[in-house]
């Protein structure tokens, strides 16, 4: 890569895109025990394997797949200042650089906030801001849009364009190709840990839908990627549904602050219902409250006409969290599935593992999987558990086209077994393929 170039790393989940980014930022081999590097890597004149990390960090800034893995502070302001303080920058200069960065990124609403209370998308935006404030020469972005809403993606696109205009170098490992298609100089397809093909921006846009699907690539045209074609949600019934979920005036307060406003909607048995909305409006808190993991302070939730308190909701509902690292406990992929599938025969476990392209990984430790593979494993566990209500929070985060389609097929197949499914997602392709209708959650 030349200075000032923007290169996209694309391809199916688990093919080695994140590994390439770790070679560039020095995490391999410096922070990956047992991993050996052969060959040569040079970044800004340094070999990342032999350069002190604090020195390399002046030149290379990284945004990881899981934003929580790179926070060092409890508040957003401290997080933004952390790298500059470690580099010995003057306090007045730190304040000025933070002010300029949050203004350019339009993330002023993230200042003076507790990091742990932010939504997944807000955390992603904060991580990018904490990297940008350091003004590195090279930006390494691993799935930077995984948890972002449409507005935040547009802001990120414009900021990458501004970074490139300053002569910076950008490497993006990403499945959402549409948001960088007009910024890149070339795209590199990674398959099986090797460079399989390279595309110019024109060649990438010229790929047919069949060719993209064969390569595991998502839509390149924003008009296709952002189109939502599922029907509008029907009006709420006067009373609770006789068969399905009914929320009436359902709301949550946290420290006297309303996390999401009272909501009322229905999820019939056999339906897949989408929930969309901007980052931070309370979508994840809503499904956590529906699952009995967060306190609901107003309204009620009924299932098949009967009210459910928090304990009853925990018995009826299965939640696949946005950060699936919180719900992987076993020491193998198969063990994880069997933990969730008490009473399910081995053939059914084999079937689900094969459907989600995990059968070749069944002996692997869940924490050794890529982000997309972990996501598919969490979905597999939920499918095997046999709950009556399935809640999915960003289930396609980090998934390539083929695996997104497979999750969609399995979710729709599960709905046919007469269960209720709610999907929180920013993924318009998945929403259009999977949901019978959708609700949009707004602040207030």
Language model region names:
Residues 10-12, 276-278:
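The feature captures the beta-strand-to-loop junction immediately N-terminal to the Walker
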Residues 25, 291:
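Helix-to-loop junction immediately C-terminal to a conserved catalytic motif
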Residues 40-55, 300-313:
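ABC ATPase NBD Q-loop/coupling interface
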Residues 92-110, 346-361:
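Conserved ABC ATPase "signature" region
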Residues 114-118, 122, 365-369, 373:
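Conserved ABC ATPase signature
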Residues 139-142, 390-393:
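Catalytic Walker B motif of ABC-type/P-loop ATPase nucleotide-binding domains
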Residues 174-175, 425-426:
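H-loop/switch region of ABC-family ATPase nucleotide-binding domains
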């Amino acid at each position: 890569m030349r200075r000032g170039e923007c290169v996209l790393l694309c391809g199916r989940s688990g093919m080695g895109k994140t590994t390439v980014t770790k070679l560039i930022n020095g995490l391999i081999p410096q922070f990956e025990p047992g991993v050996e590097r052969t060959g040569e890597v040079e970044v800004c004149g340094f070999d990342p394997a032999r350069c002190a990390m604090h020195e390399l960090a002046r030149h290379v800034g990284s945004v990881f797949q899981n934003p929580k893995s790179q926070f060092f502070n409890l508040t957003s302001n401290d997080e933004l200042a952390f790298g500059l303080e470690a580099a010995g920058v003057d306090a007045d200069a730190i304040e000025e650089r933070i002010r300029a960065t949050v203004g350019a990124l339009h993330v002023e609403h993230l200042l003076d906030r507790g990091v742990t209370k932010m939504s997944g998308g807000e955390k992603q935006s904060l991580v990018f801001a904490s990297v940008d404030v350091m003004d590195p020469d090279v930006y390494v972005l691993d799935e930077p849009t995984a948890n972002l809403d449409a507005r935040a993606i547009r802001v990120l696109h414009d900021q990458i364009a501004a970074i490139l205009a300053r002569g910076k170098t950008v490497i993006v490992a990403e499945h959402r190709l549409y948001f960088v298609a007009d910024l890149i100089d070339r795209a590199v397809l990674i398959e099986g840990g090797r460079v399989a093909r390279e595309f110019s921006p024109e060649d990438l846009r010229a790929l047919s839908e069949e060719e993209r699907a064969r390569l595991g690539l998502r839509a390149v045209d924003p008009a296709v990627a952002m189109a939502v074609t599922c029907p509008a949600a029907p009006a709420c019934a006067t009373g609770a549904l006789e068969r399905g979920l009914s929320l009436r005036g359902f709301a949550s307060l946290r420290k006297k602050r309303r996390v999401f406003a009272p909501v009322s909607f229905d999820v019939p048995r056999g339906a897949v219902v989408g929930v969309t909305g901007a980052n931070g409006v309370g979508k994840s808190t809503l499904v956590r409250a529906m699952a009995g993991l967060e306190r609901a302070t107003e309204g009620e939730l009924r299932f098949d006409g009967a009210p459910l308190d928090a304990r009853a909701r925990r018995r009826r509902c299965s939640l696949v969290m946005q950060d699936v690292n919180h719900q992987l406990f076993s020491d193998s992929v198969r063990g994880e599935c069997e933990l969730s599938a008490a009473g399910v025969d081995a053939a059914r476990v084999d079937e689900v593992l094969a459907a989600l392209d995990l059968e070749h990984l069944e002996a692997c430790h869940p924490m050794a999987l890529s982000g997309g593979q972990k996501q598919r494993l969490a979905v597999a566990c939920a499918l095997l558990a046999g709950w009556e209500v399935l809640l999915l929070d960003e289930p396609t985060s980090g998934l390539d086209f083929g695996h997104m389609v497979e999750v969609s097929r399995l979710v729709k197949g599960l709905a046919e077994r007469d269960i209720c499914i709610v999907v929180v997602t920013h993924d318009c392709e998945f929403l259009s393929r999977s949901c019978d209708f959708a609700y949009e959650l707004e602040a207030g």
